[in-house]
């Protein structure tokens, strides 16, 4: 993992290789890592997420996202999810709605994440500590 400061936001970027994130306990570990590095946002490569994350009926996406949001840590899923989105209207809608907000983003790559961090935040998505 590495830490980057992007447009005034401290970002914890997970490595492509590593254990899959599949449970609320894994999300709690992300929170701990983010806090220990004073990161506001955790960027997770799509390859690190359990495939069940993208099957919304499992509830895993909600559990993981909620755990981070509870601790005011934002989440960015980084990578190509076009194949799984094409197979699920519900997931497509979830991704679209998430990308409208400021807590969970699905981005194609780190360049898109950096561009999102430059854009103004939606109302109600105050930065931690503000």
Language-model regions, residue ranges each:
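Amphipathic, Lys/Arg-enriched alpha-helical "gate/interface" segment within cytosolic domains
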Residues: 2-130
């Amino acid at each position: 993992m590495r830490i980057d400061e992007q447009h005034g936001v401290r970002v914890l970027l997970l490595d492509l290789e590593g254990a899959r994130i599949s449970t609320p306990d894994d999300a709690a570990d992300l929170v701990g890592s983010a806090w220990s590095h004073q990161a506001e946002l955790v960027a997770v490569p799509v390859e690190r997420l359990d495939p069940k994350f993208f099957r919304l009926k499992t509830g895993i996406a909600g559990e993981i996202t909620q755990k981070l949001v509870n601790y005011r840590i934002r989440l960015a899923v980084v990578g190509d999810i076009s194949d799984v989105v094409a197979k699920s209207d519900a997931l497509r809608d979830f991704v679209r709605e998430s990308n409208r907000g400021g807590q969970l983003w699905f981005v194609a790559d780190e360049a898109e994440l950096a561009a999102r961090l430059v854009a103004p935040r939606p109302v109600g998505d105050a930065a931690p500590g503000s």
